[in-house]
Amino acid sequence: MMLKPEGLKLIDENGRRLDGRKKYELRPIKMKVGVLKNANGSAYIEWGKNKIIAAVYGPREIHPKHLQRPDRAILRVRYNMAPFSVEERKKPGPDRRSIEISKVIRGALEPALILEMFPRTAIDVFIEVLQADAGTRVAGITAASLALADAGIPMRDLVAACSAGKIEGEIVLDLNKEEDNYGEADVPVAIMPIKNDITLLQMDGYLTKEEFIEAVKLAIKGAKAVYQKQREALKEKYLKIAQEVEGSEQ
């Protein structure tokens, strides 16, 4: 959160935000599954101006062997922002923020996976941010969950994520870059919608108890809308496969 430039209004008198959205409106979201041929599973997401690709490899052998778990697979997540993903070109390779977000995403995804089915193996998730525009962790979680499903990893549920926040004293859904920079708070949430479980809940900034509850409820509502888009993306891929199979049989 940064000091807001004088005269900048994040919401106008008609309740419209800088990008024209209403308070409770998501940015445009597009998802595609199975975008990388060499990965076991993959997904691509455009969320506002965010462009993120996720790839899953595994279950596969772990080296060195002392990292193996005899009772379950281990989930390894690497979140990385490409040097060209932000306006000020960043140094290549993982920084402290990327390492922290990798851990956060792993914690959000792990409850959904049935890791006990693959003892002594690893499931590797790579998330590459090609273009960043606020909310990369929730978009990354959403894409990674799709890629895991695409890889055929047994899951209790998909994980869908969204954030809410506070700008100009108002609770709003899905902050964009300016709102994230100059707003008062950001609350990213990840859920397993069918099980109704929260797998990630964070807060950056300050909210009263009432505002926090309102923001969490709004983020959950947003995540449920994201979940429907995840389902559509998976259906689209497998309907296409079914059509190809039918076509080859004729």
From Swiss-Prot:
Coiled coil: none annotated. Its EC number is 3.1.13.-. Signal peptide: none annotated. Catalytic component of the exosome, which is a complex involved in RNA degradation. Has 3'->5' exoribonuclease activity. Can also synthesize heteromeric RNA-tails. Belongs to the RNase PH family. Rrp41 subfamily. The keyword Cytoplasm applies. Keywords: Cytoplasm, Exonuclease, Exosome, Hydrolase, Nuclease. It comes from Pyrococcus furiosus (strain ATCC 43587 / DSM 3638 / JCM 8422 / Vc1). GO terms for cellular component: cytoplasmic exosome (RNase complex). It is an enzyme of class 3 (hydrolase). Component of the archaeal exosome complex. Forms a hexameric ring-like arrangement composed of 3 Rrp41-Rrp42 heterodimers. The hexameric ring associates with a trimer of Rrp4 and/or Csl4 subunits. It is found in: Cytoplasm. GO terms for molecular function: 3'-5'-RNA exonuclease activity; RNA binding. Its main location: cytoplasm. One of its GO terms (biological process) is rRNA catabolic process. InterPro entries: ExoRNase_PH_dom1, ExoRNase_PH_dom2, ExoRNase_PH_dom2_sf, PNPase/RNase_PH_dom_sf, Ribosomal_Su5_D2-typ_SF, RNase_PH, Rrp41. This is Exosome complex component Rrp41.
